[in-house]
Amino acid sequence: MQTKRLIFKNSTGDRAYIYENSIVVEFGVCRNGISTSELNGGYKKNFKTAFNHYLSQENIDFLENHSIKDYLIRQSGILGVDPKFTTGLLTSAQMENACVVTKQYRNLEVSAITTAGVRVNASRAGDSASYYEENGDFQFDVGTINVIILTNVCLEPGTLANGLVTATEAKTVALSNLRIPSQFSNGFATGTGTDGIAIFSNSEYDNILSNAGKHSKLGELMAKCVIESISEAIKRQVWITKESQCSVLARLRRYDLDINEFYKNITDKEEFIRLLQAAARKQENVAITTSILHLIDEVENNLLDKKIAYNLADSILENNCSDYC
């Protein structure tokens, strides 16, 4: 077994370590929780640990002949945790790129431990499906945003489920802020096809909180932890930031435009690419492109008449792009 490296500890005695291609959280108190995992998924009591595991190509091949639950039980043994009292999430993101964010207010503390990969598997709720599951047979895609949330207070099952909704909405906010494109449609991603969330509360705490929605301070802290940790984890894993997204080419990526199409008939391709990238970074060009793309979105969502949007887009180009005509 690899040497454990401590990356996080909190006021309740929880400790998170990186080892064996995983982040393992060892709980310092008795915890109940809710998880999307196939190992002890749903609501459970008496969790002792939780883990997030990097799924290598070799292990993806292993899954072709085994269930995800069987794999997680096998991995529990490798990590030295009891499969009866743990839950595990899978991802293709590197554990070294994880981000931990903690927020506090008075006696309330919330932490999120997050990994995020969005290059391959980012998708929008309602996109065409990638597979149809029957009798447990389906395809496993790589990508994945996984979040483990820890609170120092006690939450009942309904409150944990409420927190799951808040955390999911916060994930969508993080992706929206970065304008992450879906890989399966022209829309913006709301997550990936294989995201996982696990939320744990302190069963030993006397004060039981009843709400984790957006109006509650608990919900606010959960959401802020999720938004910040996902944003930073994406930066570490795939180098997507607000700065990198401030580009015409980045904004057009959701339309599957191939940069090679821009210069296939150009003789001096190197110079053309240099000029194209410089032009793509200009704030004015990003603003023009974004304005027109927003009009397209309005039309596709039946919120704006196509002819009106077309005329306005044409006017934007005519009034702002005369230097290029």
For the regions a language model picked out, list residue spans one by one.
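Alpha/propeptide regions of enzymes that mature by internal proteolysis
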Residues: M1-C325
